[in-house]
Amino acid sequence: MIEVQNVKLGTLISVFFFGMIGGTLRYLLSLKLASTGTILVNLIGSFCLAFLTYYVIERQKLPAWLSTGLGTGMVGAFTTFSTFTVDILGLSTFTDATFYLLISVVGGFLLAYTGMILGIKLGKVGDRR
């Protein structure tokens, strides 16, 4: 198999293929469920990634290309919240998990706010032209 910087081409193709499926599923659910779609997608994704990580991948010993395709590709494209949740579950102490949660939520909010303000300002500059 061809390797690209120590990543096998089959794994990249798997992530791409399953990513298309996950992204498409997310889009279709958001069309059907409107405002409740996001929370449903995040909850389903959290369950799916945890299930894949802690049961299927560990117990069933799937090939690396398939487990990466399903986890990073499909669930990752379906939602990034699931990855966030599994990361917190993997931390060794409650303090570490709390710190990670606070940094993620507060940092995410601050960056979203900054992006919003920057977008508004750049949008107004574009209106003047």
Curated annotation (Swiss-Prot):
Na(+) is not transported, but it plays an essential structural role and its presence is essential for fluoride channel function. It catalyses: fluoride(in) = fluoride(out). Its main location: membrane. GO terms for cellular component: plasma membrane. Na(+) binds at residues 76, 79. Keywords: Cell membrane, Ion channel, Ion transport, Membrane, Metal-binding, Sodium, Transmembrane, Transmembrane helix, Transport. GO terms for molecular function: fluoride channel activity; metal ion binding. It is a multi-pass membrane protein. The chain crosses the membrane at residues 9-29, 37-57, 74-94, 100-120. It is found in: Cell membrane. One of its GO terms (biological process) is cellular detoxification of fluoride. The keyword Metal-binding applies. Belongs to the fluoride channel Fluc/FEX (TC 1.A.43) family. Fluoride-specific ion channel. Important for reducing fluoride concentration in the cell, thus reducing its toxicity. This is Fluoride-specific ion channel FluC 2. The lineage of its organism: Bacteria, Bacillati, Bacillota, Bacilli, Lactobacillales.
